[in-house]
Amino acid sequence: MNKADKNSLKRSKEITNDYFLFLDQHISDVISGNVDHFLEINQIADKLSLSHKHLTDTIQKETGNHPCHYYDLKIIDQAKNMLSNSDKSVSEIARTLTYDPSNFSKFFKKFVGQTPGLFRKESKI
């Protein structure tokens, strides 16, 4: 592997790491109320000083999945945590995560395979 290939590989890993760190901070900011909405992937790319295509291609090459996949999974992880460890209603959690409650339930069920209410009930057992 030549030096240019090594540098490209190193840069790809750096972009991927920066993306995941940004997602963690951004999702935390939304949950805490410091930010009132989730950014789109093109907006995240802009914040990372990348084109949308470069970010998408890099994440897909490094991980095998589209950046949206990880964005959604990280939101689902936060939702699961809130459902398991808080007394907030499903509607409150949905609104905290900037979702309409009915859309949130569909989104959650798509990834988890059960409704937020059922997940909460089973996680308390």
Model-based region annotation:
Residues N42-Y70, A94-L118:
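Basic/polar phosphate-binding segments, predominantly the helix-turn-helix DNA-binding elements
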Residues M1-S12, T56:
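Basic, amphipathic alpha-helix used for nucleic-acid engagement in HTH/winged-helix/SANT-Myb modules
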Residues N2, S49-K53, Q78:
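Short C-terminal domain-edge/linker segments immediately following a structured domain
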Residues E62-Y99, E122-I125:
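Terminal helix-turn-helix DNA-binding modules in bacterial transcription factors
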Residues K10-L48, H69-D87:
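A short, Lys/Arg-enriched amphipathic alpha-helix from helix-turn-helix/homeodomain DNA-binding modules
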